[in-house]
Structure formats: C-alpha cells, structure tokens
A protein has these predicted regions:
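Transmembrane and membrane-interface helices of multi-pass
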Residues: 25, 29-283
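Solvent-exposed soluble domains appended to multi-pass membrane proteins
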Residues: 296-559, 563-565
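Intrinsically disordered, low-complexity serine/threonine-rich segments
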Residues: 7, 14-15, 272, 337, ...
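Membrane/wall-proximal cationic-aromatic binding patches
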Residues: 229-326, 337-339, 344-349
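N-terminal targeting leaders characterized by basic, low-complexity, disordered sequences
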Residues: 1-26
Length: 565
C-alpha cells in the first residue's frame, strides 16, 4: 500500500543511525536499512595497519635467507626497529580523503621497498656488501653493474628469493582493495600510532644498550653505536636499520673513540734503550708532546696523545734486506690460497713456496669491496666505514707520505707507475692513485688491451706494460688486477681457461674461480720471464696480496683445497 504522498506503508521501515551511513538491503517492495558492521570496518583498518610491518619483515627475512644470514638471532630487533618506519608508511597512505589515492600511494611504496630490497640482494650476491649512500652518490652502484651478464647471473642464482620478494606486491595489488581500509586517519589516530611506534623505538634502543660495556665488536651496543659494519648490522638489525644508521651518520657525522695505550709510556726508554745490540728504535723526529700543547683541536690532541703513548718498533733481522731493490706490488682481485696449485698455477705455487709465507693474515670483504682493500694495502690503514675512503682522501687532498709511491719518489726512484686492466676512473682510481705518488694508466687512460671483454686479461696487461719500466734504472710499480673477479660462470677468463679445469670434481663456480686465476698465473709467468731476461729478477721484490677474499665463493672456505685432493 502506498500513501498519496508517495511514502511506503508500514510493511517497510527505515532505520537511520546517527553518524553512520545507511545501507539499503532487500527488494523494491520490502526495503529496509541496517547499520554497517563496525567490527568489519575495524578489522580492515587493523589489517592495513599491520600490513607494512609484515611486509618489511617479509622482505628482511627473504634478504637474510638469500644472503646466508642468521634469521632467528636478529629477528626481534629487526622487527622492533621497523615499527617506526611502518607507522610512517601507514600514515603516508592515510592522508587523502580519497581511498583510491591512498591505495595508489601504498602500492607505489610497496613496489619501491620491493625493488630496493631486490637491488640490495643482488648487490650483496655480487660484491659481498650492501649499497650505502656514498656508493649511490659517487655513482659506484651504477658502475658496479657494468655488465648485463653480471646482473642476470646474480639474479638467476637467487631467482627463488627474487620471486619471493614480489609476492607481497602481487598480493596487495590483487587483494588489497578487499582486505584493507584505505580511508583517511584522523589526527588523533595519527598521534596514537606515532606515539606507540616511538615507544617501541625507545624500548628497543634501551635494550640495545644493555651490553654497552662489552668489548665484543659484534655486541648489540657496538654494532649499533660503533663503526658501521654494514653486513653485520644488516644481519642483526635488518637492512632498514643499517640504512638509517648510514644516512644519519652521513648527515650528522660520526665521531669514533680513539684508543689510547693503557700502559704509561716509559719516557726513559725510547731511542736510547736497545733491547739487543743490533736493534734500533724507529722513532720519528716529531715532538708529539709539543704538538699536543700547540693545538686547541680536541681530535688532533687525541691523535697526538695516542701517537705519543705508543712504544716504538725496533729494527730486526729483516730490516734493510731489500734496500735498493725494485718493487712490484700487486693487488690481485679476489685472490686466495685456493688459487695456488702446483699443476694449475705453477708460477703462483713457485712464488708462494720460495717467498715469504705470511700466517694469520686476514682479508675481509670490506665495506666498499675492492677499493677498501686497496686502501688497506697501500696505506696500511683501516678504511672508514660508510664512505669511499680512498676517493675521499684524494678529494680532500690528504697527504700519504708513507705509501710506497711517495717513499719511492723520495728515495729517487726513476719510474713510479700504477696500472689497472679495467676502466680508469672506476672507484675514482685516477684520483687516489695519483694522490699517493703514482703515474697511472688504465683502460681509457693510456692502456689499450686490444679487446673489450669482462673481465680483462691480467696477462695482456703485463704484456702491454712491462716495457714501460723494465729498462729503468729503478722502478716501483703497482698493479690492480681484475681477471679473478667474481661471477665465474660467465667470467671471460674462466671461459678462456675452462679446458684446464674441466675434469676437476668441483662445481662450475669453483672451477671458474680456478680458471680465472690461471690467467693471473700466466701474467706472473710472463712478468718473471721478462725480469729474468732483463737481469732484474734477482733485485726486484714482488709482493702479491688480495683486495678481499672471494666472497662470491664463501662456501669454498669449508671445502678442501684442490692441492689437498
């Protein structure tokens, strides 16, 4: 029945609720309105609030497993430290009154996080370290992926983990609209979310400080407040926290504690004290006590006091052994004892057995991979974490008077050259090698190897450069090789020497590593032959070391050496 004013009869009723939109239900003849279910809306909002913490935890866990990190040990810290980031991301997706806009922002943020974690996963797989801000700003991350083969091989080797990274993004795109509430969050709600997140952050930071008195460099406190150890921090606290610490230290600076000698220096036992008749104390003429009093700079004072507190070193039976010798210093890419084999690399084996064998010699992956290894080799110093130490030193015109290059020039050496068989400005080598006294040549700067391959041949580099100095009265030469670079399944040098290792009972990667170092062995064979022919072999000191261990073959260190089989 319908009244003259057009309203319905009493068979249908309208129920209106203050503050809630009415929802029409039923047929055209029997319409009624019901109140929306509050619990359903609350569940969708709660699900959205939980989405970003779970997303980041998923990405962190996938990255850790793919990188071989301990997942359980740092699980709690990783999760708790991401709550603030998660809260910020949720609020960024809740500012607009239009739900579609908020959902679009959430999709973009999810994609950005996924891609960034993927980049870090592949970068670590190739270089054994994480991308830090300085690598991005210096263009190093872009330079690093200088070969599409390198990228594709790294992705292929971690394809399962790469696919898993994109699972949350696919899930969000397909089901996000049904499962989550993207409506705007009121100011009061935003403040509550932020306060809860900050409370978790403060509590987690306090928990980190519990072992602040620990001397362990890998303690929770030292990892968080000490020198940034990218990989260790990423394993314990997660990638996000590592990036946050890196950015904060870049923006606000970081002052490390300078270690001082706990033993008081005996002022009477300096140059006049000789423990044995033939030993002499090696002491500079600098008066550090006077220098300490002459400056108001606290950092300089700390350094002067530290140097003044140190006991001098003394001459020994090796002092002066190589006086007047020519020097060839070689930093061999990813070199290790596993590349030394009497059958595969006989020249390296000969050099090892007839030369000095250093024990307790450790070479880490470093924070910035090869260039940090070079920095340690050529300066004798530990590189600063989070920056390109060698590049920065050249940029700031830092003097290194004790490097081989500078000392060789001081002693009147006629030829002081450095060579690299890759792009000349990679890692800014053209700046820092010249800054420490070398005349530098590389691909694109005076060195042409006649082929464009990755990596280039160490043998060809020797063949193209030895004539530059072999006839000089005295020379000091530095080489940075590249044939042993990781990615041995596609390494051109591995392929070039593949027939020599094909029958070994190892994985293709291990055989590729050995094959790549055969090219280094050929380079050493050529170098020694040229030195002998020129009559320079007996008065030339050759030092060969690595830039870092072969991190792309870290499992190699748990397997027997080829020469043990």
């Amino acid at each position: 029945m319908t009244y003259s004013d057009g309203t319905n009869s009493g068979f249908s009723r309208r129920n209106h609720y203050v503050g809630q939109p009415a929802v029409k239900v039923g047929s055209s003849n029997f319409d009624y309105y019901r109140k929306p279910e509050k619990s359903h809306g609350f569940a969708k909002r709660a699900a959205f609030f939980a989405y970003f913490p779970l997303l980041i935890l998923w990405l962190e866990t996938d990255l850790k497993i793919a990188s071989g990190f301990d997942v359980i040990g740092g699980f709690a810290f990783t999760f708790l430290f991401t709550i603030v980031l998660s809260a910020v991301l949720v609020l960024l997706c809740s500012f607009s009154k239009r739900r579609g806009v908020n959902r679009g922002i959430a999709t973009v943020l999810t994609a950005a996080l996924t891609i960034w974690y993927g980049v870090q996963m592949i970068y670590y797989n190739v270089f054994g370290t994480m991308v830090v801000v300085s690598s991005v700003t210096n263009g190093g991350a872009g330079q690093a992926f200088n070969s599409i083969d390198m990228i594709m091989t790294a992705i292929t080797s971690r394809i399962v983990f790469v696919v898993l990274l994109f699972v949350p993004l696919a899930f969000f795109i397909i089901f996000g609209g049904k499962l989550f509430d993207f409506s705007k969050v009121k100011l009061k709600g935003k403040l509550i979310v932020l306060l809860i997140a900050v409370a978790f952050q403060i509590g987690t930071v306090l928990a980190v400080g519990i072992d602040r008195d620990s001397s362990d460099t890998k303690s929770n406190y030292n990892l968080y407040y000490g020198e940034l150890q990218q990989v260790a921090v990423c394993e314990r606290y997660g990638l996000y926290t590592m990036q946050r610490l890196d950015i904060s230290r870049l923006m606000f600076g970081y002052k490390a504690n300078i270690r001082t000698n706990s033993k008081p220096k005996n002022k009477e036992s300096t140059a006049d004290e000789i423990t044995k008749p033939e030993q002499k104390a090696q002491i500079m003429s600098a008066d550090f006590s006077k220098l300490t009093k002459s400056t108001n700079n606290d950092e300089l004072k700390s350094l002067y006091e530290y140097f003044d507190s140190e006991e001098p070193s003394y001459t020994n039976e090796y002092t002066g052994m190589f006086k007047g010798y020519n020097i060839i210093f070689i930093t061999a890419e990813s070199f290790s004892q596993y590349a030394i084999d009497k059958d595969l690399t006989p020249t390296l084996c000969k050099m090892y057995n007839e030369g000095f064998q250093f024990e307790n010699y450790y070479s880490p992956a470093w924070g910035v991979s090869t260039t940090d290894g070079e920095y340690a080799n050529l300066t004798g110093l530990i590189p600063k974490s989070g920056v390109w130490s060698f590049s920065k030193s050249a940029e700031n015109n830092v003097s290194f008077p004790f490097t081989l290059g500078e000392q060789s020039r001081k002693l009147g050496c006629k030829t002081v050259n450095a060579y690299h068989n890759h792009t000349y400005d990679y890692y800014d080598r053209d700046k820092y090698l010249t800054n420490i006294g070398y005349d530098y040549s590389a691909i694109g700067k005076g060195l042409d190897l006649g082929e464009n391959v990755w990596p280039n041949s160490d043998l060809k580099m020797m063949q193209k450069t030895v004539d530059d100095y072999i006839n000089s009265d005295s020379f000091s030469v530095y080489y940075m090789t590249v044939s042993g670079h990781g990615g041995y399944s596609y390494n051109t040098m591995s392929e070039r020497n593949a027939d020599l290792v094909k029958d070994l009972k190892y994985s293709d990667e291990v055989k590729g590593y050995l094959a790549a170092n055969i090219e280094l062995d050929k380079a050493m064979e050529y170098l020694l032959a040229r030195l002998e022919k020129a009559g320079k072999l007996d008065n030339t000191l050759i030092c060969l070391t690595d830039d870092h261990y072969p991190y792309s073959l870290c499992l190699l260190y748990t397997s027997p050496s080829p020469r043990d089989s």
